[in-house]
Amino acid sequence: MIQIQSYLDVADNSGARKLMCIRVLGTGNRKYADIGDIIIAVVKEAVPNMFLKRSEVVRAVVVRTRRGLKRRNGMVLEFDDNAAVIINQEGNPRGTRIFGPVARELRECNFARVVSLAPEVL
């Protein structure tokens, strides 16, 4: 579960290293984001000489959470970290590579481009 003020790792090569969630997008006043949800975040740590700088406000999709994701067959999927991929307004990733595994549920959330770039889909 990602809420406001939560820190996330960045799972792509867009230039950011750490994000802080400042808003969870969706209907109503949502408090938490799960895998596949879009958040508004601020870049807290960035790689020098890249196109994303510190204190930039970006949109990101959550790809990994430490809280378990329960599937219909009863399996619970837990990751070691909270991570997100930075996306543009159309929902395409801004980076060209994605690091680490992502959940299969992203394909159902219309993030097929993110799933296709991922090295491992669980």
From Swiss-Prot:
It is found in: Plastid, Chloroplast. GO terms for molecular function: large ribosomal subunit rRNA binding; structural constituent of ribosome. Keywords: Chloroplast, Plastid, Ribonucleoprotein, Ribosomal protein, RNA-binding, rRNA-binding. Pfam families: Ribosomal_L14. InterPro entries: Ribosomal_uL14, Ribosomal_uL14_bac-type, Ribosomal_uL14_CS, Ribosomal_uL14_sf. GO terms for cellular component: chloroplast; cytosolic large ribosomal subunit. SUPFAM superfamilies: Ribosomal protein L14. GO terms for biological process: translation. Binds to 23S rRNA. Part of the 50S ribosomal subunit. Belongs to the universal ribosomal protein uL14 family. This is Large ribosomal subunit protein uL14c. The lineage of its organism: Eukaryota, Viridiplantae, Streptophyta, Embryophyta, Tracheophyta.
